[in-house]
Design a protein with these regions (language model features):
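Conserved non-transmembrane functional hotspots
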Residues: 19, 23-175
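Feature marks short, highly hydrophobic, charge-poor N-terminal signal-anchor/signal peptide-like helices
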Residues: 1-13
């Protein structure tokens, strides 16, 4: 028994060391799992954010083309409203599921900015469907849509901790 008592401090040290190693490994694995899960969700949110922007931009481009046909926009590929309607319907149908994914996975700030952007696009669509020739009013709608897009992209960058990006406003036609 005397020999056992002499070895007891060493045995306790081994047990404490083993428990310490176990705790360190478990905590390290948990931290790695949380980091990997966060990275996966960030990648997924980025996909959802980009997909929403792509689907909304389809509608924007179609409104530019119809507005060009009406003489409100300088877009180089005009399209009359009759030809555009099925394309607009398709763009809207594609926009709805990506909007639902955005609501599900997006941060409240991003969703709010997306709402502001899509509202501006819907106003452009309503204006275009009236077949009005008013370049000044169209320009105001375009400016609101562009501000909505900038707000959306800024919110996405903030949510994903990305650096600030380009505003997306560049001169395509000399003023």
């Amino acid at each position: 028994m005397h020999a056992f008592l002499q070895q007891l401090p060493a045995l306790i040290g081994v047990v404490i060391g083993a428990l310490g190693s176990y705790v360190a490994i478990v905590r390290g694995d948990q931290a790695r799992f949380r980091r990997e899960r966060a990275a996966r969700w960030e990648e997924r949110r980025l996909e959802v954010y980009a997909e929403y922007a792509r689907t909304l931009k389809k509608s924007v481009t179609l409104t530019y083309r119809v507005a060009s046909h009406l003489g409100n926009d300088p877009h180089p590929h005009p399209l009359n409203l009759t030809e555009a309607e099925p394309l607009l319907a398709e763009a809207t149908v594609g926009r709805d599921p990506s909007g639902e994914a955005l609501i599900l996975l997006g941060s409240p700030e991003v969703v709010e900015q997306a709402r502001a952007w899509v509202t501006a696009v819907m106003e452009m669509e309503r204006f275009m469907r009236t077949e009005t020739h008013d370049p000044v009013a169209w320009r105001e709608l375009m400016d609101r849509q562009r501000a909505g897009r900038e707000g959306y992209y800024a919110a996405v960058r903030d949510d994903l901790a990305l650096p600030p990006g380009h505003s997306g406003r560049w001169l395509t036609v000399p003023e």
